[in-house]
Curated annotation (Swiss-Prot):
Gene for this chain: apaG
Database matches in Pfam families: DUF525
Coiled coil start-end: none
InterPro entries: ApaG_domain (IPR007474), ApaG_sf (IPR036767), Uncharacterised_ApaG (IPR023065)
Domain ApaG: 3-127
Domain of life: Bacteria
Protein name: Protein ApaG
PROSITE patterns: APAG (PS51087)
GO BP terms, alphabetized: error-free translesion synthesis
Amino acid sequence: MTKDKRYAFSVKVETAFVPDQSDVEQNRYVFTYTVHIENTGNVAAQLISRHWIITDATGKTQEVRGLGVIGQQPLLQPGERFQYTSGTMLNTPVGEMRGFYHITAEDGTQFDSEIAPFQLNMPRVLH
């Protein structure tokens, strides 16, 4: 793995609570997350796999690993962006996700791009 700035991706995430698919009485809280990925290095690189760590408010952790994202392994040129939306379900109204993407540059260099922790929160309703 390398920390060389030629091999770098920027990852930003936006989240949303999905009330129509959630059931509070059954402790089922559904969230979507939209991920914005940009190749900020100067070498073309392909996202090969993902590793998510999902933690609910009780500390229960679930790990999700798999090839690509939403069935794709995007190849990004320097400065190119890719965006996708996916979802997850928690047993609590609050949680956190974090992880990394495993990436291979066109020259064969492999590196991981960290996905900083982000919150999943059900909005509170005031009466």
